[in-house]
Amino acid sequence: MPSFDVVSRVDFQEIDNAIANALREITNRYDFKGSNTTLERNEKVITIVTEDDLKLTEVNEILISHFVRRKLDPLALGKKDKEKAGGDRIRQTISLVEGIEQDISKKITSEIKSSKMKIQAKINGNELRIDGKKRDDLQSAMQLIEDLKIGIPVQFINFRD
């Protein structure tokens, strides 16, 4: 019985490379000269510290562009919390999304069941296993999942016949 897994994973090495490239661009840009802007990752959190809102939005745009250049999905950048740091500085913490949450997996499962395809979806922790009788059904399920606007990056792994 053909099957595949639906997961949401991020490559932390590529994220580190994207952050390093973004930092390099920030240090070379004229509008960031003397602004002492920092960008760093600890575990699953990216922290941006800069002077004002304009520079913060610029750093976010630079970070997203470097994510795209490194073939990382910008949807992996989750919640963005902005707060005051010491002095006139602003700190933003961005959580990285990894794994499919329970409510999102239930939404995917219900969409698959409502599509009337002859496939089954099972929730295994923070990933989904999709089983079906035909390979074509599984490929149409992949297309259905990609077309859903769930707000997280998904990958399809372990495709077996």
Each PLM stretch: what is its role?
Residues M1-Q13, N17-N21, E25-I108, S114-S115, ...:
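N-terminal intrinsically disordered, cationic/polar leader segments
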